[in-house]
UniProtKB/Swiss-Prot annotation:
PROSITE patterns: RIBOSOMAL_L35
InterPro entries xrefs: Ribosomal_bL35 (IPR001706), Ribosomal_bL35-like (IPR021137), Ribosomal_bL35_CS (IPR018265), Ribosomal_bL35_sf (IPR037229)
HAMAP family: Ribosomal_bL35
GO CC term (a single one): cytosolic large ribosomal subunit
Single GO MF descriptor: structural constituent of ribosome
Name recorded for this polypeptide: Large ribosomal subunit protein bL35
Keywords, sorted A to Z: Ribonucleoprotein, Ribosomal protein
């Protein structure tokens, strides 16, 4: 059976924290800011941790990423 490969798209979007959790950036941040209020835009700047329900799937994509 061939080696698993790291999913390059996922690898560019997710970073591992010191405690081993996965950090990701938020969606809805590329355009259409006139329709979003200031609080919403401020909260979108903050990074978010990958949820527990998605963790297994994302870890498979990042098989060898440290």
């Amino acid at each position: 059976m061939p080696k698993m490969k790291t999913h390059r798209g996922a690898a560019k979007r997710v970073k591992r924290t010191g405690s081993g959790q996965l950090k990701r950036s938020r969606a809805f941040t590329s355009h259409l800011f006139a329709n979003k209020n200031t609080k919403q835009k401020r909260q979108l700047r903050k990074a978010k941790l990958v949820s527990k329900s998605d963790m297994k799937r994302v870890k498979q994509l990042l098989a060898y990423k440290k």
